[in-house]
Amino acid sequence: AIVGTVIFALLAFLLPSDVPVDRNGKIDWVGAVLGTAGLIVFNVAWNQAPASGWDAPFESILLVTSILLLLLFGVWEHKFANPPIMPLGIWTAPSFLALILVVLFSFMANGIFLWYMVAWLQLLRGASILDFGVQWTPFGIVATLGTFLAAWLIPRLATQWILAIGSAAILVANLLLATMPVYQSYWAQVFPATLFMALCPDFVYVAAQIVASNSVRRRHQGVAASLVGTLNLYGNSLGLGFAGTIETEVNKRRVGAEAVLGFRAALYFGAALGLVAVLVDLSFVRVVKDVREGWSDPADQREVEVELEEGVSTAVEGRQ
């Protein structure tokens, strides 16, 4: 992180300034606030519930408030925003809604796996932080290799299958943890589960970006890519809220060694999310192998030509 900060700070001074393509562009600040606030409050409601309980009055208030904010966001984007920060027409693009569900469920399952793997090893098996760090090493190696493997597969395999591999990987990973005994050798189930889990983020993220880019119009590609990127962290966090509620309910009136039942229930829920992601992907996401060059849609090609003309004109004005 320190090295990255130094490098990016230097690049901020060394790189030339971007040439503005749309000098008169506007940002939909109202939509940004409504959408972000709605998602945050919804997340807080679910992640606070395991500790406070759903019978706490503020939980209902938070949940209702989040829904109202998201409804207001939709109304604002549809009726008043110009231009909208998230054009609602993007949801009618082929495979896009199904893609978002697959990505959300996959990353929810991913967050559940990560949290309960740490909890199982440290709380039930007594592993130290250093022990866990060593046992987590295979993740970094396989995840790095998975990035290159996903990129290699893109021109060779239909993207929905790459997405399915990532979702199936987190399904298997959660099942391996959910079915293991409290005390067991690391190599028996935790190690293979870590290897499977390492494939999920890169396969799902890379494939989802390809599907999003192929599904929407060129002008909406930035929005689609940003939404997929947001679901990466948001899904991880939201999944813990759902899983935490399940764990809390299962472990009511259970103490000691019986607490593992709550862990298992949460991990089975993560596996169920992975299974639903696989089924939705195979049923509704359809993108062929990406071997195109340029823009196949004439309207998109015209947008590129206009942007290039405006960019050249702006650059000439800047030099003058």
Residue ranges and their predicted role:
Residues I27-T36, A164-G166:
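Select subsegments of transmembrane alpha-helices in polytopic membrane proteins
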Residues P57-F58, P83-R254, E258-F284, V288-K289:
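12-transmembrane solute porter fold
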Residues D18-V30, K79-M86, V291-Q301:
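Flexible cytoplasmic inter-helical loops of multi-pass small-molecule transporters
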Residues A1-T5, L63-S66, W136-P138:
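Structural signature of hydrophobic alpha-helical transmembrane segments
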Residues V19-V21, T36-F58, F73-W76, F80:
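Phenylalanine-glycine-rich, low-complexity intrinsically disordered regions
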Residues F8-L15, F42, N47, L70-E77, ...:
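Structural signal for membrane-spanning alpha-helices in multi-pass inner-membrane proteins
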Residues V287-Q320:
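Intrinsically disordered, low-complexity terminal tails of fungal membrane proteins
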Residues A1-G31:
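Helix-loop-helix hairpins in multi-pass membrane proteins, especially solute transporters
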